[in-house]
Amino acid sequence: MAASDLESKAKEAFVDDDFELAAELYTQAIDAGPATADLYADRAQAHIKLGNYTEAVADANKAIGLDPTMHKAYYRKGAACIKLEEYQTAKAALELGSSYAPGDSRFTRLLKECDECIAEESSQAPAKNVEAPVAATVEDKEDVANMDNTPPVVEPPSKPKYRHDYYNSATEVVLTIYAKGVPADSVVIDFGDQMLSVSIEVPGEEPYHFQPRLFSKIIPEKCKYQVLSTKVEIRLAKAEQVTWTTLDYSGRPKAIPQKISTPAETAPRPSYPSSKSKKDWDKLEAEVKKEEKEEKLEGDAALNKFFRDIYKDADEDMRRAMDKSFRESNGTVLSTNWKDVGSKTVEASPPDGMELKKWEI
């Protein structure tokens, strides 16, 4: 098979969230030759999705070697280096890449993240020496008389700070918490209808708790997680096929639809325990539903609810048609006729007066 055909199939696999297949097809395309900068840069992105950050950096470097002005190669090198906590290397790559793509907000966002991580590392280093000047004050004879009445200076226990990020697929949100070397039995994760509770309690360390109200509803019984050597990966099964623009409900736009009917709403569920205390998830979800009931949908929200209701009552072919047409057209076409769209690629059709632009990642 020609390299161009393999590259096309690799792109299709990536769009379908089959990142392992995408990486393998890019490898076959590179072996078939010629090995282009685009192939290495795109395989780097597949490696990032798979968590193979060292391989991603290697591929990005090969792409840069073939095309020193390819901004997406620098971007992917920077993104992978951040995951490896190589912040200075990431910053250098992102700064150079942004010079070839001025105005690209993605570089601005990652550079800001880099600066924050570098500042955090810098602030942690001198903190260990804070006790030295405090101890030296004992030598001051004028203060010796007051030492008996001075409470001892106690250094606060170190609190683990785990970074996290997430990405969307059509059916789930994958949340990654970067907690290295955490024993599996120290991790307790509970799922609610629109709630997530993560507790990590390592002996001798301050407990870590992360309990957001989620951007949208999930299906608790389909959610799962895995504790790995460098991270905790949590897969949240979406109850409705919308793109999460943030992880937490507090950051979601007002226009995003809220209400959705699922079998899980009518079936009684037990309260989900956490590692510290028992939480009544049903009570929390009742409060969420009360807020949703009081919300008045209008504009885009009302339209989204209309389409969601169609999807809810549709048969399997109608749902397949809606999913395929919406995904392949970048959200510009929604068809319920599987016979019409099942055997062809649905072309994008932006509204009158608007121009379709591809966003390169």
Swiss-Prot record:
Provide the GO MF annotations for this entry.
Answer: protein-folding chaperone binding
Q: Which GO terms describe its cellular component?
A: cytoplasm; nucleus
CS domain mapped to chain residues: 159-248
CDD domains attached here?
p23_CS_SGT1_like
User: What PROSITE patterns does the annotation carry?
Assistant: CS, SGS, TPR
Q: Which residues carry this modification: Phosphothreonine?
A: 150, 262
Query: Could you state what the record's PTM comment says about this protein?
Result: Constitutively phosphorylated at Thr-262 and phosphorylated at Thr-150 upon infection with the fungal pathogen Ustilago maydis.
* Compositional bias segments (type: Basic and acidic residues): 277-295
Q: Which Gene3D superfamilies match?
A: 2.60.40.790, Tetratricopeptide repeat domain
Q: Name one GO biological process term.
A: defense response
What's the protein here called?
A: Protein SGT1 homolog
